[in-house]
Amino acid sequence: MDIQAIKEFLPHRYPFLLVDRVLECEPGKRLLAIKNVTYNEPFFQGHFPRVPIMPGVLIIEALAQTTGLLASETAPDVLGKGATYYLVGLDKVRFKRPVVPGDQLRLEATYLRHKRNIWAFACRADVEGEFVASAEIMCAAAEQGS
């Protein structure tokens, strides 16, 4: 799935669209995506100018956007392409390695369960096979505009 297709599913836009491409998707199971991190990212201006590091909360946001894509692909008939998935919970958040300009962040979301409109996913971020971060992410589905 390229960026144009991603934009059909996610409401985010520059500078907050943090998924560049979907590499693999098994609806109901898992989704693997990438974020190419460049020195031109707006957050590097202040975090930190001499030692640029991607903020951990933005790594989590990239993972949350990945979960929204997996949920949309898993249950397109629930709310359709116009659905918005809101981040409603985080558990077991861990960070191990900083993400710096030039890194390609691999984002993996694995479906755990859902009840009504709340979805849960196990998520992991890596750079070149090296563990960066992980979290259990919960999101809620809502129709666009609600």
UniProtKB/Swiss-Prot annotation:
InterPro entries: FabA_FabZ, FabZ, HotDog_dom_sf. The lineage of its organism: Bacteria, Pseudomonadati, Pseudomonadota, Gammaproteobacteria, Methylococcales. Belongs to the thioester dehydratase family. FabZ subfamily. It is found in: Cytoplasm. Involved in unsaturated fatty acids biosynthesis. Catalyzes the dehydration of short chain beta-hydroxyacyl-ACPs and long chain saturated and unsaturated beta-hydroxyacyl-ACPs. SUPFAM superfamilies: Thioesterase/thiol ester dehydrase-isomerase. The keyword Cytoplasm applies. Pfam families: FabA. GO terms for biological process: fatty acid biosynthetic process; lipid A biosynthetic process. The active site is at H47. It is an enzyme of class 4 (lyase). GO terms for molecular function: (3R)-hydroxyacyl-[acyl-carrier-protein] dehydratase activity. Keywords: Cytoplasm, Lipid A biosynthesis, Lipid biosynthesis, Lipid metabolism, Lyase. It comes from Methylococcus capsulatus (strain ATCC 33009 / NCIMB 11132 / Bath). It catalyses: a (3R)-hydroxyacyl-[ACP] = a (2E)-enoyl-[ACP] + H2O. This is 3-hydroxyacyl-[acyl-carrier-protein] dehydratase FabZ. GO terms for cellular component: cytoplasm; membrane. Its EC number is 4.2.1.59.
